Each structure stands twice: as structure tokens, then as C-alpha cells.
Amino acid sequence: LNKHGDRQYEIAQTHGVVGDYPIKTGIIYDTSVVETKYKAQYHNHPNFSRPSLSQRFIYKDSLEFVLCTNHFKSKGSRNAKGLDLDQKDGQASYNYKRILQAKTLLDIIDSLYFDENIIVLGDFNAYSQEDPIQALQSTNLNRLETVNHSYVYKGKNGSLDHVFVSDNFIDHIDHIQTWNINSIYPSWINYSHNLADSSYFRSSDHNPMVIGVNR
């Protein structure tokens, strides 16, 4: 990013142990727009497949908010047992696990960031009407609606990626959109394949989401 663009980005420095997870979330920020306050914090909990990560930012020297990024358990059935087995209700495997992860995330937010400006986002591996998303929306978190899908699975469009904003911060959001640069393109141009080029298309299997924040 820094080599090919005009902006200067940094990786949020973290506090806390990540553990031995093969996948972890991270936060990259534009130093000309926001500054960090304290180090980013990984939230390790037995219910998480990958620990949640939060960073406190100050936007344009005045607006303070917390960004919390997440990656919930996937829908794959490998090693699923008991309540994590596919219940044939359309929510696939590990729905129970994802519900627990949603509730754990809410407990963390309530404990550490109660009544603060907060944006909660990530790959929740759940569609908008599924139990984990409904659990998150049952609080003071508002899911921001976007027109385009974020993922394609076996030719079917849907959104596994979501953005939630606390009641006291929603007036600072002026737009949200899904940038459709990944999911509609074939996997053989994925960045990890030999046929990949230097464009941003298919840089991931999920589409990024763009949020506009104002003071």
C-alpha cells in the first residue's frame, strides 16, 4: 500500500497474546486521517475461533471511537459435533459456536466499551437473518444495510460480512457500500494463484466494505 499509493498506512500495534491460531485479524490505518490511542487489544476467549481485535482511534483530532474486527467460525462441517452439527435449518455447521461467539463479543463490548462510540465489523460467517447476527442486533448495535453482496458460494450471492455501529455513533456514519471487486471474479485469478496479476481484483474471496465517517 505504501509503495504504490500516496497515503501512508501503518499496522495497529497489538497488546495481548494472539495464541497459536493459524488465522488472525489485523487493522491497518491511514496515519493522515486517524491516530491511535493505546495499543490494539486482542480478546482471547475459548469461544472464539480467532480472537477479536479492537483499536481505539481519534479521528481528525476530535472524534474518538473504537474499531472492533472479528472473524467467526466458518460454516464448514469438519470436526463438528453435537450442537455444532448442521441442524438442517439453513444455517449450516457450527451455528451454535457462532452464537456463542456473538454473545461473548457482546460481553466484551459491554465490559470494556459500554456507552462508547464503536464500530463492530468483520467476517461473521453468518447471513443477516441467522441467529448470530440477530443476537448482535438485539443490543444497541445497528447493522448497516448495503446493497451488494459480499460473498458468492456455489453461484449464490449473500453477505457474510457485516458492519454494526452503536446507537451513539450512528449519526457519524454518512454512507456504506460493498466494493464488488472480489466475489464475482473467478478464483483462478486469486492472488495466491500463478495467474494472478497486480490488480486489486480477486485480492480476497470476500468483498471489502467501505464506510464513510464524519465528525
Regions flagged by a language model, labelled:
Residues 1-215:
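Divalent cation-coordinating acidic motifs and surrounding scaffolds
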